[in-house]
């Protein structure tokens, strides 16, 4: 999401500023509203270019095909996702299976993993985020998030929640891991 919400709009704005006097009839409106929004806008014909931090899903590809729209995936950059916890949490590393179990609700208390005890508060991006889809695919093996996982609109919101909650865990793009009140957990 770091790329979709920040970098790509900045690059687009810089391109527009540099070419504002060029004689062409192309118009741009830049809006960073989530990967699903960009893909849907291309499929629905409301835009020619849609920004997305993930590839179109099978459902989106089928919808595009049924409407005669050919989607082209053109990568411009890559990001990574980090799992974060509050700085006071003694957990240093987790297996991918444990991360899956936390976010799907199979593990509900830190005591199941260590001497640190407290009800886990898990934070996720909302469903329109490409980061949400990537994390669900990579870490949850496409399983559903538990209903108690709180969905946030931005990486900044996840960091803010984990900063103030000693039992919090979340995932964010790498550009958001610099807060002294959180730490990145290594994944085995």
Language model region names:
Residues 1-188:
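Exported/periplasmic ABC-transporter solute-binding proteins
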């Amino acid at each position: 999401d770091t790329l979709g919400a920040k970098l790509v709009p900045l690059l687009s704005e810089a391109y527009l500023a540099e070419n504002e006097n060029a004689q062409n009839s192309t118009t741009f409106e830049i809006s960073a509203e989530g990967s699903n929004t960009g893909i849907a806008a291309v499929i629905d014909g409301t835009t020619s270019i849609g920004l997305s931090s993930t590839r179109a899903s099978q459902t989106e590809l089928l919808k595009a095909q049924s409407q005669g729209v050919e989607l082209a995936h053109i990568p411009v950059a890559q990001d990574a996702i980090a799992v974060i916890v509050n700085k006071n949490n003694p957990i240093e590393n987790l297996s991918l299976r444990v991360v899956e179990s936390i976010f799907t609700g199979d593990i509900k208390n830190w005591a199941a993993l260590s001497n640190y005890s407290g009800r886990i508060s898990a934070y996720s991006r909302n469903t329109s985020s490409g980061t949400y889809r990537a994390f669900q695919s990579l870490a949850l093996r496409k399983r559903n998030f538990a209903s108690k996982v709180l969905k946030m609109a931005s990486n900044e919101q996840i960091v803010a929640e984990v900063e103030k909650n000693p039992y919090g865990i979340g995932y964010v793009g790498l550009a958001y891991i610099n807060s002294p009140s959180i730490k990145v957990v290594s994944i085995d």
